[in-house]
Amino acid sequence: MSLIKEFKAFASRGNVIDMAVGIIIGAAFGKIVSSFVADIIMPPIGIILGGVNFSDLSIVLQAAQGDAPSVVIAYGKFIQTIIDFTIIAFAIFMGVKAINRLKRKEEVAPKAPAAPTKDQELLSEIRDLLKAQQEK
């Protein structure tokens, strides 16, 4: 089998296509969450904390010199990224939880018939004995 045919067979399998769609949707969802956090959640939090713009929060390690930019630890952006991650992780958790719940409902097998009671067993034995006597 040629390399192109092998690749085509690999790429056309359902799992690979599903994964690719999931990655594309996940990337788009990540951008939506990042915008939601940066543009909707963080501004009110900044106002509550005294007009702080989280994206500007940083510690300057070395001031700008000439054309070289300053060296900073941008912990405000890091805080935003942590909030992004938390929201995405929670959304994925809720999605997986919903999918697992649906799978459990599908997997519920029909209950096996209950074991016969002693009375039923005795009646079955009597029936079998009567049949055996009639056949003689």
Curated annotation (Swiss-Prot):
Keywords for the protein's UniProt record, in alphabetical order: Cell inner membrane, Cell membrane, Ion channel, Ion transport, Membrane, Transmembrane, Transmembrane helix, Transport
Tree of life domain: Bacteria
Matching Gene3D superfamilies: Large-conductance mechanosensitive channel, MscL, domain 1
Molecular functions (GO terms): mechanosensitive monoatomic ion channel activity
Keyword Transport: yes
Entry-linked NCBIfam families: mscL (TIGR00220), PRK00567.1-4 (NF001843)
Protein name as annotated: Large-conductance mechanosensitive channel
Organism (species): Shewanella baltica (strain OS155 / ATCC BAA-1091)
Native organism taxonomy: Bacteria, Pseudomonadati, Pseudomonadota, Gammaproteobacteria, Alteromonadales
Gene giving rise to this polypeptide: mscL
